[in-house]
């Protein structure tokens, strides 16, 4: 799909090109109380009051997300007009904009429209410019057009005809909007990879498959990939990671992916993604109902790989290292048992009280491994706890960090990217729940504050660098009729790296 940017100040009569240029449809916003947006006012004049008449007749009340096609419109180059309700003008925010953009794309994708002129990006949204509107609109469109068909014997072809979108933007934002469009496409491509990996079944997306995906990313985008096998992992003394992997016939992999966009001496940001390609719970077996969704337990790994693809396509001037410990968590005659004690790469001994708290066991060795890169920051991403889902639901990812500056950067990125996160506590008092009578630390801390104690466990392995943990158990995928991976938190991670790179 082709995206292009054209500057236009509708209030200064600069709209001639949009009024006369050929297009299948022009998208206009209408607020409640019959208020027309700037572009809608110009189109209304050119069509001799058509928009006003439609609004006054009550056919378009401006309620958020409502759409109305006006066919065979005369006086402008576009053959059709799509009116989109924006809701109340004084309540028009990021969510209202995304709702309006999504409603517009859904209406357009259900038609044979091939070329669209999109004016909503110029609407004022929380003091953001048109470039933000362009990026958000492209991501909303790509979200609507995403389909997972890899496992279908006869995939259905795309049903829409949309090929080209022309965005009208404020002239002062034109350069930034062009960059935003390129970044949005790269980001959407990264999210698509993340969603594809998550949606693949566990018998396809194995640890070896993730390793091969990393190698392909390296080949396609000029990255450097290292994929360590069982013997190399054993040589590194990653006893905690291996305690999870041991009962599966699928060999574990330890993936390290390097992107160098800055000087070699510049400290990298390290992203660590949990890669449990299927989680049965091990000996602490999960209930059968809903266990199929445990293929999504590698979404941390998928989001890290998707972010690396996006970063490489954007060409960010920053160094990034991705680390993915990946294996299955299976029961078996040689599986780790509740009460077993294992030794981590750091040397700390861990009493495994519950084998279904395995994510932290593979992440802790990866976090220790990250020390060798002398990182500027380390962010781990994991579908770590059901407790985080109970606490935050499916809207906010849980953000844990003792570093206020790093946490602030990530929260700013989450707001800019419309990829919500909420900072959770990480007080030292919670560490007491992880005490063990027999080892240095237990892998669970009981039912109270389960998401917090999981993060506290990880914090024991991150003392040498700035660190943050994102628990995406509630945001990485959706259940029910809309079941599927979401691609989150790729937007948050990518925006954080864009900000760090100053781009």
Swiss-Prot record:
HAMAP family: Cytosol_peptidase_M17 (MF_00181)
Stated family: Belongs to the peptidase M17 family.
Compartments in which it is found: Cytoplasm
Biological role: Presumably involved in the processing and regular turnover of intracellular proteins. Catalyzes the removal of unsubstituted N-terminal amino acids from various peptides.
EC code: 3.4.11.1, 3.4.11.10
Note on how the cofactor is bound: Binds 2 manganese ions per subunit.
Organism this protein belongs to: Burkholderia vietnamiensis (strain G4 / LMG 22486) (Burkholderia cepacia (strain R1808))
UniProt-recorded name of the protein: Probable cytosol aminopeptidase
Manganese as UniProt keyword: yes
One term of GO molecular function: metalloaminopeptidase activity
